Amino acid sequence: MQVLYKSTRGKGETVTASMAILKGLSEDGGLFVPTEIPKLNVPVEKLAQMTYQETAYEVMSRFLTDFTEDELKNCIANAYDEKFDTKEIAPLHEADGAYFLELFHGATIAFKDMALSILPHLMTTAARKNHVSNDIGILTATSGDTGKAALAGFADVPGTKIIVFYPKHGVSPIQEKQMVTQKGDNTYVVGITGNFDDAQTAVKKMFNDQALAAELNEAGFQFSSANSINIGRLVPQIVYYVYAYSRLVGKGTVKAGEKINVVVPTGNFGNILAAYYAKQMGLPINKLICASNENKVLFDFFSTGTYDRKRDFILTTSPSMDILISSNLERLIYRLTGENAEKCAELMQALSEGGEYTITEDMKKGLADFYGNYCSEAETKEAIHSVYKNSDYVIDPHTAVADGVYRKYLADTDDHTTTVIASTASPYKFTRSVMEAVEDETESMDDFALADKLSEISGVKIPKAVEEIRTAPVLHDTVVDAPDMPAAVKKILNIVRD
């Protein structure tokens, strides 16, 4: 069965998987979605015997149908190798009555590594398949983790240049240090004076700017994206939910076919959308639990059916979720409309022009798969403290939001179905927030001293990703206002000169 990709807004052309990965965004501003969700059709008992790499092939080959077996297996082998510090790639850790799916064992100690380790290989393979002669300019907005993972993935990849925009005052010190010390002749990091939504909106505008596209083409470039708007980011994320379920079956924790709950700390909606797609493929998932921080636009949407971005933007200790315009929700909205691209485009236009939209009662019925809630900053801190106290297990603030929301779900439903919590970042990325929750005396210590202390109390070695940046020199120090982002891109790509 060939799976093709079409736009959520209906005006763009239907394309192959490789072309969707190259384009990133459809020309009508919509996101690429598969023409149908393929079924997994592999016995779970068989999946339970597979490695992560073998599972990845089983899942991804069903979505990326124009890649040959050799091409895809080659991409997978190059992605999931010794860059990860465990052979399991994404191990499960049982703690405090749940199973934490550790997605932070890659090069940059965040879940973004799971997809961004393979995206450069998918993209360069796709370029070859489609006889693309232009170099690819990767434009990425980051709320903290995507940036470093994308930089690490694309560093020194021939035929690419990657430009990452991040909110100068909206990421953790370690997140920023990881980005601004990035090596690679084709890597560029630019701070902006606005927030993540400003960066993401400007990146999307550049994708849809036909005049800019013509200038790029003349200079021998074309844009693509490493953000989760790219289907090449989303498909690899489905893999780890399938892998987690097969591990639970393999260990005898659940029987084949028995349902589990999945909790995902959510900002841009990509990670939980991957779990939703896994469920559509046939993975036995009961509830998809969407955990928000104080930027609770998604919780309000699940509660009321109205998505309203007209609110204050709050900086929290879980910065990767500090988002008011949740881009991947558009893919769910498209499914909820019954794949009515015209209706989806109308709702997205309402969001763009008026800052809000409301879904119909019929569409609301499709949200039955989801449970949404949020955690305050105090509740997030308490969750880190509580899991550590009960299980000697240290979690980062994003995972803590998920844990806190899971406790609320239990209180609301008394549903004790086996539950997997997506653990999206290493606590070492957020040492100050984590240590403030588990220890009293932290104020006088810098972030690296806190990392040493965290290692001491947790018994977990400091990851290489943190050790490497301790003394690394700053290589990127450009800061611009959000409206000046296109000019920065042109300068980097040598389309204009000083």
Describe each PLM feature range:
Residues 1-498:
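PLP-dependent amino-acid enzyme catalytic core
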